[in-house]
Regions:
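N-terminal helical cap/lid subdomain that shapes the substrate entry/recognition surface
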Residues: 1-58, 62-63, 75-79
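Asp-based, Mg2+/Mn2+-dependent phosphohydrolase catalytic module
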Residues: 30-35, 54-61, 65-148
C-alpha cells in the first residue's frame, strides 16, 4: 500500500473521483458529475484569487522575495495560474501531483524547500486550510499566515 499522502496525476484524479462517488452515493450519474467537475475546475473561470492577494504578492515581489504557489492540485495548476493575476506573477508553481506528495506530508514541504533552495525558516506559507496549510506548515518549520 502507498503512504497516505503519496500522490500522482493518476492518484489525484482517482481520489477526486472517489470523493464525488461518496458525496453522490454512487449514483449512476457519478461518472458524468465527476467529468463535469473535473472540466469545471480546469477552467480559469472557476478560480477567484483572494481580494488582497494582489497587494500581498506585490509587496513580496517589491521586496525582492521569491513567490511560489504550492498546492494540493494537479498539473492543470500551471495553465490556470498563468492566466490569473496575481497568480501569474509567481516565480514557481508546485502541484502536489508533480511533487509526488500532497500536504500535509513532510515530503511535500521538503521538496518545495529543495526546489526553492530555501531553509524552512526562510519560507512564509500563506494558506486557508487550518490543517493542511497552517498546522502542517508550522510542523515543517515554515512561517505561516492564515487567510480566509
Amino acid at each position: 500500500a502507498s503512504p497516505p499522502f503519496a500522490t500522482s496525476s493518476r492518484r489525484e484524479a482517482a481520489r477526486r473521483r472517489a470523493i464525488v462517488a461518496e458525496v453522490f452515493d454512487q449514483q449512476p450519474e457519478t461518472d458524468a458529475i465527476f467529468a463535469d467537475l473535473w472540466d469545471h475546475f480546469g477552467r480559469v473561470e472557476a478560480w477567484r484569487p483572494l481580494p488582497f492577494g494582489s497587494s500581498l504578492m506585490r509587496a513580496a515581489l517589491d521586496r525582492g522575495l521569491t513567490v511560489a504557489l504550492a498546492s494540493n492540485f494537479d498539473e492543470r495548476l500551471h495553465a490556470i495560474a498563468g492566466l490569473i493575476e496575481p497568480l501569474s506573477w509567481a516565480d514557481q508553481v508546485f502541484a502536489s501531483s508533480e511533487i509526488g506528495w500532497r500536504k500535509p506530508a513532510a515530503e511535500f514541504f521538503r521538496t518545495v524547500e529543495q526546489r526553492l533552495g530555501c531553509e524552512p525558516a526562510e519560507i512564509l506559507l500563506v494558506g486557508d486550510d487550518p490543517d493542511l496549510d497552517i498546522a502542517a506548515g508550522r510542523l515543517a518549520g515554515w512561517h505561516v499566515l492564515g487567510v480566509a
